[in-house]
Amino acid sequence: MQLGAFRNRGVTVPDCLPGFGHINRYWDPEHQVFAAKILPGEFYVTRGNEMIVTTLGSCVSACVRDRRLGVGGMNHFMLPVRGGDPNHWEGDPLSTATRYGNHAMEQLINRVLALGGQRQELEVKLFGGGRVLAGVTDVGKRNIEFAESYVRTEGLRLIGRDLGGQYPRKVQYFPESGRARSKKLLRTRNDTVVRREEHYLHEIDEQPVSGDVDLF
């Protein structure tokens, strides 16, 4: 989004980093900060004083930042179910589920590193993976297992998590400070979240994993 393209009560949304112009960004009066709202399949990275927001059902989000520079971001993804045993993604590094999860994590981490972040300074927080989508397969559990395994295998520093349960949750992340808030949505089943994630799951089950990402 270009400077001056959107105004809210006289506040101009500043330029974002290249490649994130499609992300919905706005002024959040409660926190007095600009916010970027990401949807399933999206990610966002910033080096400024911004808040990244998403609502998770069975999907998971990884919040990653360089703790010294304050550069960081958040993704929002789930593993596709098609191909192999839907209850066991692990054990096959070439499986569709593993490759999709790796891509979701690596595109986020690579952008942080490209902005000057150092791998040894990265810290991670994980959210989501609720049992929200109906079906025999516990999609949320699979997503949690992948995210935790990825962080462990890559030797990343996991400093916080809010995972599992039966409710959707709203997550707010402030990469500059590393602060994160997770609020469970207890009062409603939140059909919007469920429909959005069901549509996303159908899309990723139908589409091939796009591109190979090498972690540097």
UniProtKB/Swiss-Prot annotation:
<protein>
    <recommendedName>
        <fullName>Probable chemoreceptor glutamine deamidase CheD</fullName>
        <ecNumber>3.5.1.44</ecNumber>
    </recommendedName>
</protein>
<dbReference type="InterPro" id="IPR038592">
    <property type="entry name" value="CheD-like_sf"/>
</dbReference>
<dbReference type="InterPro" id="IPR005659">
    <property type="entry name" value="Chemorcpt_Glu_NH3ase_CheD"/>
</dbReference>
<comment type="function">
    <text>Probably deamidates glutamine residues to glutamate on methyl-accepting chemotaxis receptors (MCPs), playing an important role in chemotaxis.</text>
</comment>
<dbReference type="GO" id="GO:0050568">
    <property type="term" value="F:protein-glutamine glutaminase activity"/>
</dbReference>
<comment type="similarity">
    <text>Belongs to the CheD family.</text>
</comment>
<keyword id="KW-0145">Chemotaxis</keyword>
<keyword id="KW-0378">Hydrolase</keyword>
<dbReference type="InterPro" id="IPR011324">
    <property type="entry name" value="Cytotoxic_necrot_fac-like_cat"/>
</dbReference>
<dbReference type="Pfam" id="PF03975">
    <property type="entry name" value="CheD"/>
</dbReference>
<dbReference type="GO" id="GO:0006935">
    <property type="term" value="P:chemotaxis"/>
</dbReference>
